[in-house]
């Protein structure tokens, strides 16, 4: 039983889950097996913790690269497991440089979900199966016009196709988080190239997601280094009277391209 194994390791090494690392160990064998079934070939695991998912991935995949920044957990992984096909790397994933994998399977720390995901978007892999906070996952898949449609929704749609596979209750973890989680399946599918102007446009628009476009851009004019005189320049901006939260990614790209022409 995984819970028994968890408490054995915690007691043996006199450790407890670290709040600073947002550690909630996934202990549901059902969920672990479900996630591991999506791993194949060379798989990346971010934050292996005490190795419960790592162990299952090692049996299903050709090679596992497990990146863990907690030195105590790295030492435990190396002492407790004798993996032939697992490389345990002590590093902060946000600084990790290797980019080519067949799949990614991970229960990632909720506190850095956005940073981890956007780093993954710049890597090369076929699919990623990731465990997120449920609310975060819903923002990922939200569409124009929906309540959760956000900057995160826009960027995820540009880089990928995402579906939520299943929800996971707090009881699947130790310690139990206060929120439900969701397993998301990501396939890279970049729709178009983006630049700094596009990223600033998205940030400017969704800072005022309920406003109409020309007002949202004007009220965020400092993002573009502009003053009050910028208002007159926005008379011909595309979709000027549309509410920001109704725009799809291609309409936002039109707005960005137009802004790039006048900045």
Briefly describe each language-model feature range:
Residues 1-200, 204, 250-263:
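Catalytic cores of RNA-modifying enzymes
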Residues 206-263:
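C-terminal lobe and adjacent flexible extensions of AdoMet/dcAdoMet transferase-like proteins
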């Amino acid at each position: 039983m995984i819970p028994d194994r968890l408490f054995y390791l915690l007691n043996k090494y006199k450790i407890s889950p670290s709040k600073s690392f947002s550690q909630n160990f996934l202990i549901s064998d059902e969920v672990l097996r479900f996630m591991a079934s999506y791993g194949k070939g060379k798989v990346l695991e971010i934050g292996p913790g005490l190795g419960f998912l790592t162990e299952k991935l090692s049996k299903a995949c050709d090679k596992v690269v497990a990146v863990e920044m907690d030195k105590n957990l790295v030492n435990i992984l190396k002492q407790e497991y004798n993996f032939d096909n697992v490389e345990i790397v002590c590093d902060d994933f946000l600084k990790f440089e290797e980019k080519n994998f067949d799949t990614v399977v991970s229960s990632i720390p909720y506190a850095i979900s956005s940073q981890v995901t956007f780093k993954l978007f710049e890597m090369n892999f076929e699919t990623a199966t990731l465990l997120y906070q449920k609310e975060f996952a819903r923002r990922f898949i939200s569409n124009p016009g929906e309540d959760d449609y956000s900057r995160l929704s826009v960027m995820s749609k540009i880089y990928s196709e995402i579906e939520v596979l299943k929800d996971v209750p707090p009881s699947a973890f130790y310690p139990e988080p206060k929120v439900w989680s969701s397993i998301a399946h990501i396939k890279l599918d970049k729709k178009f190239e983006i630049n700094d102007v596009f990223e600033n446009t998205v940030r400017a628009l969704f800072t005022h997601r309920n406003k109409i476009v020309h007002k949202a851009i004007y009220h965020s004019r400092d993002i573009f280094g502009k003053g009050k005189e910028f208002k007159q320049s926005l008379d011909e901006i595309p979709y000027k009277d549309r509410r920001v939260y109704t725009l799809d990614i291609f309409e936002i790209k039109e707005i960005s391209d137009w802004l790039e022409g006048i900045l």
